[in-house]
């Protein structure tokens, strides 16, 4: 993005694509969506859910635990109405109010819940915690869970991990908006991330996408490593339907990525270039071409940052310190269209969501 900030020793190991953890096998186990961190310093973990509802509204929620300056536990909630109106809130919880299970996904923060077994999930947000916004939803998976190899991308002792527990599923239940509750249906997605070092020490940025084209679910990403970790890009592609997985590929030996359509108006000029069109091709001739058409969200992270007591008293100073360090992370989310071309040449049109995270 901008000039380099000191993120620790320069003696940092590069990513080695060939020798990444690959011992768990193809079958994802229920325990893998349970808590994977032990609260050691610099660890973090989150369980993420999003849904596109039949009325055109969008829901995003994430249950987060981080262990940087101190142990912190919070839920972020974003609701976009059918008219495009946006509501966002971040709520922090005390350690005595939270619970994390290791054997399966069972995360509780007061009366808020994220619980499931890779097939079915309950996700609940208490409207009392979120200014009369909330939901009580069920997510039922229609596609097998996915991770690239073991899901752990490691550079020396430092790592970032990702499990797409529900690549695509059916959503049902109720949602409360401004204190009024209604029943809803739609489609949804759930993934789980964890790691043991600040992300800026591993990546400059990433592009991530999920979408549906005909019967096919597509997930892809490209992680852009910082120079001290090799400075190269790490592509990932997954294509599946309800019956089988067609593509499960990771790394530059199997995937080629291309970008175009420079994003001109969303970021400071000193930031690294980011692009709203993204393509990926596998060595066995599957390809995905994405066009980011409509901006759903464009966030300067520090402007949205919410801090618990007592740190919120010093938020202006903390923000100024970060900005003075020339770090200006942005998060942009696009409603997207895409084309999926299968190995036999068949082409399917679809829609999805693409996100760009500029970490520095």
Predicted stretch roles:
Residues 4-360:
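Structured soluble/peripheral alpha/beta segments that form catalytic or ligand/cofactor-binding pockets
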